[in-house]
């Protein structure tokens, strides 16, 4: 399971060093793509294949489905971490998420999200403010 919060730096070549505890999970490859709220999603390759299979089931007659697929898949990039656990975040995704040097990487269970640290801090403050109110509706049985 991919969980936790980490604060790596983006190097001058646009590379992210994956947190050591996740490197084995990504050893066979990963897919980086546009994430919602302007972050970068990082899926283990096998997990992304499942996501893609679910997307294929969406009705082609739905404009919302077509739009979502286009935005997600047009920004997708296959990567294989190097021996030091580094992956290059392509310029199009760095621009999408407004990534600079300071990053926040969060585990969300089945994927990682890469955020600009300032953007993450603002997002988290807003999300945390409504956390107590949202739990029963968002995650049945947790409240």
UniProtKB/Swiss-Prot annotation:
What keywords does the record list, in alphabetical order? Cytoplasm, DNA-binding, Repeat, Transcription, Transcription regulation
Q: Which PANTHER family match?
A: TRANSCRIPTIONAL REGULATOR MRAZ (PTHR34701:SF1)
Specify where it is mainly localized.
Answer: cytoplasm
GO cellular component, as recorded: cytoplasm; nucleoid
Q: How does it assemble?
A: Forms oligomers.
The record, for NCBIfam families, names: division/cell wall cluster transcriptional repressor MraZ
Domain (SpoVT-AbrB): give its ranges.
Answer: 5-47, 76-119
Supply the SUPFAM superfamilies for this chain: AbrB/MazE/MraZ-like
Query: Which region is the signal sequence?
Result: none
Report the sequence similarity comment from the record: Belongs to the MraZ family.
Gene encoding the protein: mraZ
GO terms classed as biological process:
negative regulation of DNA-templated transcription initiation
The record's subcellular locations are:
Cytoplasm, Nucleoid
**Stated name of the protein:** Transcriptional regulator MraZ
Recorded GO MF terms: DNA-binding transcription factor activity; transcription cis-regulatory region binding
| CDD domains, A to Z | MraZ_C, MraZ_N
